[in-house]
């Protein structure tokens, strides 16, 4: 239900655009009481389907239902959006493009975004593709070789640091090294990461389904071998 954290993603963008730590802290629920209260309130609304939910009546229509209580709170806070795919957006866009392109008969090549999503369309198995691997060591992002693969694949790269230009307004690093990331949880409205990075891939699912399956594991206190085995049993590696 993280897509219902739209107001908090807007606050996170303000945090990440800050010029110094004092300004950033005003938008940080870990450092500011008002921001913490807001994060808890929005998360409580986001968790409850009675407060916010989507309905798909058909004919390419979608209806967003928002409770009177949430509408009143949003008006008081000056919110302009309830819904935002934020860092997840390109996973859904790439899947849409891949399905559209395949529907027109194209089955070669890859579609990728700079923020860590890849969809390989090649069903021939005749060509190898590569994905670069990185690891954060201290404050340095180090190259750790490449992953070679073939055949249809969806790749999702979770990372707790800025890995490219799209991350500029999604991450913020304080002077003491503390990092804020876009991986907000609907449980409390705060960001959580289990490791500096996690790369998952699947030959069975698109980017969006792969992301959704692995997201909660990446938000845990630490990466669990058992949870990764569960993902593997679902053909997500």
PLM features: what roles do these ranges have?
Residues 1-237:
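Mature catalytic core of soluble alpha/beta enzymes
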């Amino acid at each position: 239900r993280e897509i219902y954290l739209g107001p908090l993603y807007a606050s996170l963008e303000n945090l990440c655009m800050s010029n110094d730590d004092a300004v950033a802290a005003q938008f940080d629920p870990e450092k500011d009481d008002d921001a913490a209260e807001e994060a808890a309130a929005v998360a409580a609304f986001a968790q409850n389907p009675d407060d916010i939910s989507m309905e798909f009546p058909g004919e390419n229509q979608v209806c967003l239902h928002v409770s009177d209580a949430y509408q009143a709170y949003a008006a008081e806070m000056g919110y302009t959006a309830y819904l935002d795919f934020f860092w997840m957006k390109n996973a859904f866009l790439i899947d849409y493009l891949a399905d559209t392109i395949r529907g027109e008969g194209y089955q070669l090549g890859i579609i990728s975004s700079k923020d860590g999503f890849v969809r390989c369309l090649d069903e021939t198995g005749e060509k190898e593709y590569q994905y670069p691997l990185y690891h954060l060591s201290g404050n340095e992002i180090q190259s750790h070789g490449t992953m070679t693969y073939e055949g249809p694949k969806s790749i999702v790269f979770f990372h707790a640091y800025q890995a490219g230009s799209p991350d500029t307004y999604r991450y913020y690093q304080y002077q003491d090294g503390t990092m804020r990331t876009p991986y907000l949880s609907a449980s409390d409205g705060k960001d959580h990461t289990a490791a500096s990075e996690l790369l998952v891939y699947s030959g069975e699912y698109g980017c969006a389904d792969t992301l959704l399956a692995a997201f909660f594991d990446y938000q845990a206190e630490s990466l669990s071998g058992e949870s990764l085995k569960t993902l593997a049993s679902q053909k997500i590696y």
